[in-house]
Amino acid sequence: MAGFWLSDEQEAIRDSVERTCDRFDADYWRSGDETGAFPEAFVEAMAEGGWLGTAMPVELGGAGLGLTEATIVMQAVAQSGAGFSGASAIHLNIFGPMPVARYGSEALRRQAIPRIISGQDKMCFAVTEPDAGLDTTSLTTRAERRPGGGWTINGRKIWTSGAQRANKILIIARTTPREAVRRPAEGLSLFYCDFDRSRIEARPIPKMGRKAVESNAVFIDNLEVPDEALVGEEGRGFYYLLDGLNPERVLIGAEAVGLGRAALARAADYAKARVVFGRPIGQNQGVAHPLARAWAELEAANLMAFKAAPDFSSAAANAF
């Protein structure tokens, strides 16, 4: 993406995603936000188009594209009018499974990733805790080895999106006490396993917005998982987690720009159509100048997001 211009291939990606999103109008998204109905039809359409696997490896059924292309996809979704209801519905599929795809055993990778890409499996990501938000190393969820093999996980997570419909869950838990490791980031492990509702309870959290995609408090009580559920090496989970969380920050930035552009477009249309004292209100500087400033700030934010995407991809490529 030299000079922040999209290549022909990237333009084609954006156009294709926009065509898919055009099938879901404002009434569709308004209804979901009013009733809390998850946008299943939208997710199915994006899965059929192959967009859930945008950044996943080709050998696992993905497109093998980079963060820039994933950023284009997610911005197009948000800008279409789907906003964060649409973006959040598929957001986790884009980079959330990357720790599994990159560090999981060969059997786990080949079992899990194709089913996530196709939409057959619906995963949620259990990271944040009531007393451990950005400070992930302070989490208290524990995974302990069972004498006969496997692990038992206990703990509480919060703000876990999609847990009401998930059949799979990616959990980060402490496997070595914090006081027993050299660095706080050590001793944390990742597990990808079934969402066993006899051992995991998900309680929806009331929110002011984005009602179509619920957030949950998750309670994990003696969840037994096999050794095969461990992603990569024991104690390295925090570092693996960053392969999903860091690029996600870029996606969120681009999604926010997309949502801002959609809002600005509606405001500009209204300013043109609303006539007061014989002329559109957009001809008044008190209306036009704030809209112009909003446009400039959105463009600056967009440049930042699309500068971060290739920079991250370049740094990540050099790290492996």
Can you describe what each PLM-predicted range is?
Residues G119-V127, I172:
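A short, Trp-centered hydrophobic/proline-enriched beta-strand micro-motif
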